[in-house]
């Protein structure tokens, strides 16, 4: 039996910046209990994460993360533009961030980032058969490209500098995909 969704009684904006809007969502659950939650306002813009393989290496980027106030190692990622497919967006982001496009794309999975407070979805794609092509991106500084041997995926999973949850989930998806080949 499908569980009845709570009824939304009201929505209001409690805070807003140029990047985020936080909403208070007043709900009534099927058992009669009222509760107010806060969430990021839903937006209809998914994102992509690109696992790029060049020969026997993963191509990672090291870029500044203001949340941790340090440089973090991870996969290429970015927002999808209106009208783009995940593959088109992934190819654009790859060219903007590391100067390569990919001829072969494999969809690995879709992830929800934090569904308790946001409706955002991220598409994880594997890009192979790379070719050089640089597009202008929106990064404030050039990103460092880091080659990591595919033969050392377990070491990367254990690395202290590769520890963001989305990257780890994507790397496990890649490992499962490669085992099936």
Where are these regions (language model features)?
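Short beta-strand segments
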Residues: 34-37, 73, 146
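Conserved Nudix-box catalytic region and its N-terminal flanking loop in Nudix hydrolases
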Residues: 2-5, 40, 48-92
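Unchanged
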Residues: 46-49, 54, 80-165
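Extreme N-terminal tail/first-helix region
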Residues: 1-17
């Amino acid at each position: 039996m499908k569980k009845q969704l709570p009824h939304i009684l009201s929505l209001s904006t409690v805070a807003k910046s140029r990047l985020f809007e936080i909403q208070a969502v007043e709900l009534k659950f099927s058992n009669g209990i009222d509760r107010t939650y806060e969430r990021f306002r839903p937006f209809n813009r998914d994102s992509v994460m690109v696992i790029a393989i060049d020969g026997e290496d993963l191509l990672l980027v090291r870029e500044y993360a203001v949340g941790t106030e340090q440089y973090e190692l991870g996969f290429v990622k970015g927002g999808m533009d209106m009208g783009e497919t995940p593959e088109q967006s992934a190819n654009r982001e790859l060219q903007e961030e590391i100067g390569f496009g990919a001829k072969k794309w494999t969809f690995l999975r879709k992830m929800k980032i934090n569904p308790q407070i946001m409706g955002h979805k991220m598409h994880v794609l594997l890009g192979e058969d790379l070719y050089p092509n640089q597009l202008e991106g929106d990064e404030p500084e050039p990103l460092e490209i880091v080659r990591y041997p595919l033969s050392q995926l377990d070491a990367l999973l254990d690395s202290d500098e590769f520890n963001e949850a989305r990257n780890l989930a994507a790397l496990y998806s890649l490992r499962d995909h490669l085992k099936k080949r």
